[in-house]
Design a protein with these regions (language model features):
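Well-structured core secondary-structure elements of compact alpha/beta domains
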Residues: 1-34, 47-73, 95-138, 152-177
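Soluble sensory domains of the PAS superfamily and closely related sensory modules
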Residues: 74-81
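Short, Gly/Ser/Thr-enriched beta-strand-loop segments that form substrate-interacting elements
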Residues: 184
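Short acidic-hydrophobic surface loop/beta-edge motif
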Residues: 83-89
Length: 184
C-alpha cells in the first residue's frame, strides 16, 4: 500500500473563454425554453462524458455526493420544466434540470461545459509547479507546507496534500487503485 501527496495548481482561464461558455449555456437554456429536449442537448453538447450519453442524467444523490455549488442550486429547484441559472463548480459551468426529488435525494440532468485552456496557460501552470518542486528539493519549505499553502485542491490542501482513497475513506491505496495519471 502507498500514500500519495499532491499539489494542484489550476491554470488561468481567459475571461473570453468563460464568457463563451456562459453564452453557449444561455443559448441551450433558450432552446429548452422553446421546447427542445434538454436530454438531447446534453447528449450533443455536454462535456461530462459519463452523464452525456444518458441525456445528462445524474442518478439520485444526496447533497454531500455532489459538488457544493451544484448541490446548492440543484436542491433549490422545484419545477422539472425549468432550467437553472448557470452554476460554476470545480468541474466547469453547468445548467441543471430537476427530474425528481425523494426526501433528501435528487435526480437531475445537466449540461457541463469547460472553458478552453490555452497552451500558454498550461505551460505557465507547469512552470509554477516546477518552481514549487525546486523549492521543496532545495528545502525552502516542506512538501506538507507547500501543499497546505499553495495547492488549489480543496480536498487535499487541508490535509498536507494527502490524496484520499474514496474506496476506503483512508489515505492508503493499493497500486492498482491509483488514478492512472498518478500511478505512472
Amino acid at each position: 500500500q502507498v500514500e500519495v501527496q499532491i499539489i494542484t495548481q489550476q491554470p488561468k482561464v481567459p475571461l473570453e473563454e468563460i464568457e463563451d461558455v456562459k453564452r453557449r449555456l444561455r443559448e441551450y437554456t433558450d432552446r429548452v425554453n422553446k421546447g427542445e429536449s434538454f436530454s438531447m442537448l446534453a447528449r450533443l453538447y455536454s462535456e461530462d462524458r459519463g452523464s452525456a450519453m444518458r441525456g445528462g442524467e445524474i442518478e439520485f444523490s444526496g447533497r454531500g455526493m455532489l459538488d457544493p455549488a451544484y448541490a446548492n442550486v440543484a436542491f433549490n429547484l422545484q419545477d422539472p420544466s425549468k432550467v437553472s441559472k448557470i452554476v460554476e463548480s470545480e468541474y466547469g459551468f453547468h445548467i441543471i434540470q430537476l427530474i425528481e426529488k425523494r426526501g433528501d435525494r435528487i435526480k437531475t440532468r445537466h449540461i457541463l461545459l469547460k472553458p478552453h485552456i490555452p497552451e500558454e496557460a498550461l505551460a505557465a501552470g507547469c512552470a509554477r509547479l516546477d518552481s514549487i518542486a525546486d523549492d521543496i528539493r532545495n528545502n525552502k519549505f516542506s512538501f506538507e507546507e507547500a501543499a497546505s499553502v499553495l495547492s488549489q485542491d480543496k480536498d487535499t490542501r487541508n490535509n498536507h496534500g494527502l490524496l484520499p482513497n474514496p474506496n476506503t475513506n483512508t489515505s492508503r491505496f493499493e497500486m492498482q487503485e491509483l488514478p492512472p495519471e498518478i500511478a505512472k
